[in-house]
Amino acid sequence: MNVTEFHQNIEQVWAKIEEQLEAQDCDVDCDTQGSVFSITFQDRSQVVINKQEPLLELWLASRVGGFHFRYQNNNWTSNDGKDFWACLEEACAAHGEIVHFS
């Protein structure tokens, strides 16, 4: 994946997140500032997702912890084999919102 493809892929990820949160009537606010996408929950806690262009990685930070994902086999996967979408669902649940992305 080159840098252009990386940015296009991340934009698709962020769009899917927003679409699913809205479609499932989640009480959250989404915001994008530069390379950072944040989801703010009712209690003001956040899930932060940012793109790391030099590494071509997607990072996720939440109450659950921090994870680094690489795009492999058409999926964002962490070094220990965790799926990005499953980790995001777990993170949202830890912040009080049940949402499904798959």
Curated annotation (Swiss-Prot):
It holds the Pfam family Frataxin_Cyay. Keywords: Iron, Metal-binding. Involved in iron-sulfur (Fe-S) cluster assembly. May act as a regulator of Fe-S biogenesis. The gene is cyaY. GO terms for biological process: iron-sulfur cluster assembly. SMART domains: Frataxin_Cyay. Belongs to the frataxin family. This is Iron-sulfur cluster assembly protein CyaY. GO terms for cellular component: cytosol. One of its GO terms (molecular function) is ferrous iron binding. It comes from Pasteurella multocida (strain Pm70). Disulfide bonds: none annotated.
